[in-house]
Design a protein with these regions (language model features):
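Short coil/turn linkers that connect adjacent helices within long alpha-helical scaffolds
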Residues: 71, 105, 139, 178-181
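Structural signature of tandem alpha-helical TPR/SEL1-like repeats
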Residues: 21-31, 57-69, 90-103, 125-137, ...
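TPR/TPR-like (Sel1-like) alpha-helical repeat modules
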Residues: 150, 154-180, 193
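Structural marker of alpha-solenoid helical repeat scaffolds
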Residues: 36-40, 73, 107, 141, ...
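Alpha-helical segment of the N-proximal tetratricopeptide repeat
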Residues: 6-65
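Alpha-helical linker/edge segments of TPR/alpha-solenoid repeat scaffolds
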Residues: 164-167, 190-205
Length: 205
């Protein structure tokens, strides 16, 4: 990731908007970041944020070109490898996305997002135990990351570890900031009730 603190902060702000906010809010941050990168003549950052803007527009092939350019200028940017992989998934190039996640981990082993997103893909294709290992690594790096607990809960649920899933879902609600993500809170509340019902049925058949 960028060594410039201002761009690191903007990347974090953008990631949070994508994860917990709206596409419009994320696009606004990406445009602001691009302007700052252009003003600073930070070529790798400029390409990275151009890629983000194209991703938000749904132009994944165009985004890949910008992430490739960012990687060429800064081969140690784990986020660019990560986001290229996400674009490939959107284009249906799933198996070939894994090497980009792995390269992101190689060049930036302390970047939590790449472990999380690799785990998300593994969970979606049924490789739940491998996904859990990725989510646990993510949480080693960022222990208060609600979206990862959400995905961890889903993977545990898929393995019928209902107790573990319940604990992880409750952790999501604990970590989400008050007053935001109301729809997510509602969905998780429903899941918690479903799991509690399953656990009660197992105890009282």
């Amino acid at each position: 990731m960028s060594g410039h603190c201002v761009f690191l902060d903007l990347r974090t702000e953008l990631d949070n908007a994508i994860t917990y906010g709206t596409k419009a809010a994320a696009a606004k941050i990406a445009r602001k970041a691009l302007e700052k990168a252009q003003a600073a003549s930070a070529g790798a950052e400029e390409e990275y944020f151009r890629g983000q803007i194209e991703m938000l527009r749904g132009n994944h092939s165009a985004a890949i070109k910008h992430f490739d350019a960012a990687i060429k200028l800064n081969p140690a940017d784990g986020a660019a490898f990560n986001d290229r992989a996400l674009c490939m998934i959107e284009l249906g190039i799933i198996d070939k996305a894994f090497p980009y996640f792995d390269k992101g981990i190689e060049v930036e082993p302390d970047y939590a997002n790449v472990y999380h997103n690799k785990g998300w893909l593994l969970n979606n294709i049924g490789r739940h135990r491998e996904a859990i290992a990725c989510f646990k690594k993510t949480l080693e790096l960022e222990p208060e990351r609600p979206v990862t607990y959400d995905n961890l809960a889903d993977a545990l649920y898929n393995l019928q570890d209902y107790g573990g899933a319940l604990k992880a879902y409750k952790k999501v609600l604990e970590l989400l900031k008050p007053g935001i993500c109301r729809q997510i809170r509602k969905q998780i509340g429903i899941k918690i009730k479903q799991i509690e019902k399953k656990l009660n049925s197992a105890l009282n058949p």
